[in-house]
């Protein structure tokens, strides 16, 4: 993901947590905050140590980033998203993870995602 599509600072994460709306399924929690002044979307990832060791956590983050890269044309611009991975992600294949991510994005009200 390009730098303009990332959330890195703690205070930006906290703003999305406090002011944003959340949607969830068994694998993910997605917080979403509208920012009309922003020309593109931004994504922040959070994978807890409870999920597994560093290898597992980094694998999950890589798969989420790859899914976002493939879906970037369908994700609404002008929004910040924080994606929190839950325990079941550790055993999922890439296809299952992407399908679950699409499902939770659709639940959050994104109409453009069709896959």
From Swiss-Prot:
UniProt keywords, alphabetically: Endonuclease, Hydrolase, Nuclease, RNA-binding, tRNA processing
InterPro entries on file: Ribosomal_Su5_D2-typ_SF (IPR020568), Ribsml_uS5_D2-typ_fold_subgr (IPR014721), RNase_P (IPR000100), RNase_P_CS (IPR020539)
GO CC term, one of those recorded: ribonuclease P complex
Record carries keyword Amino-acid biosynthesis: no
EC class (word): hydrolase
Protein name: Ribonuclease P protein component
PROSITE patterns for the chain: RIBONUCLEASE_P
GO molecular function ontology, one term from the record: tRNA binding
GO biological process: tRNA 5'-leader removal
Species per Swiss-Prot/TrEMBL record: Bacillus cereus (strain ATCC 10987 / NRS 248)
Catalytic reaction annotation: Endonucleolytic cleavage of RNA, removing 5'-extranucleotides from tRNA precursor
Quaternary structure (record): Consists of a catalytic RNA component (M1 or rnpB) and a protein subunit.
Protein's gene: rnpA
Entry EC no(s): 3.1.26.5
